[in-house]
Structures are given as structure tokens and as C-alpha cells.
Regions:
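C-terminal helical subdomain
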Residues: 178, 193-236
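Rossmann-fold cofactor-recognition segment
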Residues: 47-66
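Conserved glycine-rich Rossmann-like NAD(P)H-binding loop of the short-chain dehydrogenase/reductase
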Residues: 27-43
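Conserved mid-core segment of classical short-chain dehydrogenase/reductases
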Residues: 73, 85, 91-107, 147
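Catalytic Tyr-X3-Lys loop
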Residues: 102-119, 158
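Conserved glycine-rich cofactor-binding loop
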Residues: 13-14
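Residue(s) in the substrate-gating loop at a strand-loop-helix junction
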Residues: 138
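Active-site helix of classical SDR
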Residues: 121, 154
Length: 251
């Protein structure tokens, strides 16, 4: 990669976070933050073998928004370096059917997938002075569907927040990469039927790394990525589907 400074993965056990860590770790310290430090030993060993100068794990609960600033400060202290790449990869899919009747579950989805993301992105944009922040929107937020409107609404809100944050960071030396992937075939969606233009965590990570590399420099540019690229055309077609038909669309 050639990037200097520390790499922070918030959501260290996530499929996409792990793939990005593998591609961005060479020659730099890495901090893997997740809810509990278990389950990351294998990735830690792999990153060290791939050229990371050090790999630290950090317990982090996204729902504890009051701890977010302290988590970032602790990550920088563990790495012994300024954080120059931060990947916000935590999140939950939740259970749509349950959320329709259980307000606490609906709130949990909104908290982790929207409010906690806004909090963490705000802290990162305030603390970091250069480099890249990576956030994950989704095709699910492009137009809410009956089948997943709770999760989709969080992604719609997050996407809007990221567009504004990207404009705020323009010319600052810090850039925001907002990924809008389609259905991601991974551990979070295990057992679900893939949608058209589905992608794997590996494909998402490749696209994000390419965007980071293309925007490197003293004035990196923020970018929004449709992954895969043909998904952008499908997204615009989705906007044209009449609502009586749209409300019956599957996830």
C-alpha cells in the first residue's frame, strides 16, 4: 500500500474488515477492535505474517457511544502511531420480522447501524488529521423495502450523513471512502438467498483499496463507490419501480 501510520479496523471480526486488514497491513501497526477480544488470534497471526509491524486487539462495544473517543485514543496509544486509515466495519443485520414487533430490537439495529456509526465517524473526523476513513453504506438504503426497512433505513441515514461529512472533509487532508455494496455473501448473510449483483467481502475490499490508492496524496479525495459498478444502474432503475410493485419486492 505504501501508507504510513496505523491501521484501525473497528469490527475486527467482520468479513470485510478482515479482508481490508490483509490488504492494508504491510509495513504498519494494526489495531483490531471488536466486541470482546476473542476470535481474532488467527487474523492477528496472518497480519503479522503479511508484514504488519505489530497487531493489537482492543475490546470495543459500538453501542457504548460514550466510549468512542476513548477507544480511538487507546487504539493510537497501542499502535504507538497516528491513525491514518480507519475502517468502520461493525454492524448488525438484525431480524426484520422481530423488529416489527419488538421495539427494543428495532432500536438496537438503529443504534448499532446508524447512531453508533455517526458517533464513531464524528470522532474519527475530529481526531484524525490525514489519511482515509472507510464507511459502509448499502444498496439496502437506496430505497426502503418492506422486507428489510429497519436495516435499510439505517443505511439510508448513514449514507446521507457520509455525503455531508465527505463534503466537510474536502481539501482537509482527510478523505472519506463510502462503500455502497450490493448483497454481500458472507457470515452476516449466511443462509440467505443472494440478490442480483451480489458480491463477496473480497470483492468489496479490493474496490475500497483501489479507491484509497487512487486518492492518496496530501489532498486525498473522498469517494462514493458502487460495488460492483453496474449496481449504480440497477439502483436508478429501482427508483422507477411503482410503489405497489416495490412493496412486494424481496430483500
Amino acid at each position: 500500500m505504501g501508507e504510513t501510520g496505523a491501521l484501525l479496523i473497528l469490527g475486527g471480526r467482520s468479513d470485510i474488515g478482515g479482508q481490508l486488514a490483509r490488504r492494508l497491513c504491510e509495513g504498519r501497526p494494526v489495531v483490531l477492535a471488536a466486541r470482546g477480544e476473542h476470535g481474532m488470534d488467527g487474523l492477528r497471526s496472518e497480519l503479522l505474517s503479511s508484514g504488519a509491524t505489530s497487531v493489537h486487539t482492543l475490546s470495543f462495544d459500538a453501542a457504548e457511544v460514550s466510549s468512542h473517543r476513548a477507544v480511538i485514543e487507546q487504539a493510537a496509544a497501542l499502535a504507538g502511531a497516528e491513525i491514518t486509515t480507519a475502517v468502520v466495519a461493525f454492524g448488525i443485520l438484525g431480524d426484520q420480522e422481530r423488529a416489527e414487533h419488538d421495539e427494543a430490537h428495532a432500536f438496537d439495529i438503529a443504534l448499532v447501524d446508524y447512531a453508533a456509526q455517526v458517533s464513531m465517524l464524528t470522532v474519527l473526523a475530529d481526531v484524525m488529521t490525514r489519511g482515509h476513513i472507510v464507511a459502509f453504506s448499502s444498496i439496502a438504503g437506496w430505497r426502503a423495502r418492506r422486507a428489510n426497512y429497519v436495516y435499510g433505513s439505517t443505511k439510508a441515514g448513514l449514507d446521507a450523513f457520509c455525503q455531508g461529512l465527505a463534503d466537510r472533509l474536502q481539501g482537509s487532508g482527510l478523505a472519506l471512502i463510502t462503500a455502497r455494496p450490493g448483497f454481500v455473501i458472507g457470515s452476516m448473510t449466511q443462509g440467505m438467498t443472494p440478490a442480483p449483483l451480489s458480491v463477496t467481502p473480497d470483492v468489496v475490499a479490493q474496490a475500497v483499496v483501489k479507491a484509497i490508492e487512487s486518492s492518496a496524496g496530501s489532498r486525498p479525495a473522498s469517494r462514493t463507490l458502487w460495488i460492483p459498478r453496474p449496481l449504480q444502474l440497477l439502483a436508478w432503475v429501482m427508483k422507477l419501480v411503482p410503489r405497489p410493485i416495490w412493496r412486494h419486492m424481496p430483500r
